[in-house]
Amino acid sequence: MEQMDAHQIISFIQNSKKATPVKVYLKGDLEKIDFPSDVKTFITGNAGTVFGEWAVVEPLLEANKANIEDYVIENDRRNSAIPLLDMKNINARIEPGAVIRDQVTIGDNAVIMMGASINIGSVIGDGTMIDMNVVLGGRATVGKNCHIGAGSVLAGVVEPPSAQPVIVEDNVVVGANVVVLEGVRIGEGAVVAAGAIVTKDVAPGTVVAGIPARELKKLDAKTASKTEIMQELRQL
């Protein structure tokens, strides 16, 4: 999938059909209800479940009050512009509770942990781990064999469209609770210490820390051993 630029994302959101899907559990004399074709029904006898757009389902419920004994509605979004990514055939490990929007690219053997939020246009390279509760903003790009630590935020850029997204090159380790501001590029093999706020580019093969993040040293063997990427965690 080719990465979308900001104008393409804006157009995608603007022109998308906004959706308010609902799931309704019904009980009553349901055989008397004429369900339209755009409502999916799973009904046996006097009970069942239906799926559809609220704009269609709401008047259906109102018009058939006499035939419905009881119902419960489940709804988790309103006028949503971007569907969630269809993950069924992605060659990666994606744990429950990750929220991944459509138009996201996920490489082979990547790992997405619980609670991660990945916005439209993001790219995750082969073998990269996105840890728990990480936020990847719109168009954020992470290279291959990286680790983005729990609770970290890579700032997204959709508006203004002229701004540049965060880019993390290959073999980078980002510690927990790091914030990387928009437009920052983290060079290949760099290490960002936990809790850092990265406001400017990070040179390849360096170690940075602090608020704002500053270079501490070049990557040495000791630091490399402490930040080793374990391929065993990425096997499917």
From Swiss-Prot:
Q: Which reaction does it catalyse?
A: (S)-2,3,4,5-tetrahydrodipicolinate + acetyl-CoA + H2O = L-2-acetamido-6-oxoheptanedioate + CoA
Enzyme Commission number, as recorded: 2.3.1.89
Q: A Pfam family in this protein? A: DapH_N
Please name the pathway. Answer: Amino-acid biosynthesis; L-lysine biosynthesis via DAP pathway; LL-2,6-diaminopimelate from (S)-tetrahydrodipicolinate (acetylase route): step 1/3
What is an annotated GO biological process for this record, any one?
A: lysine biosynthetic process via diaminopimelate
Q: What does this protein do?
A: Catalyzes the transfer of an acetyl group from acetyl-CoA to tetrahydrodipicolinate.
Name of the featured protein? 2,3,4,5-tetrahydropyridine-2,6-dicarboxylate N-acetyltransferase
- The UniProt gene name for this protein comes to dapH
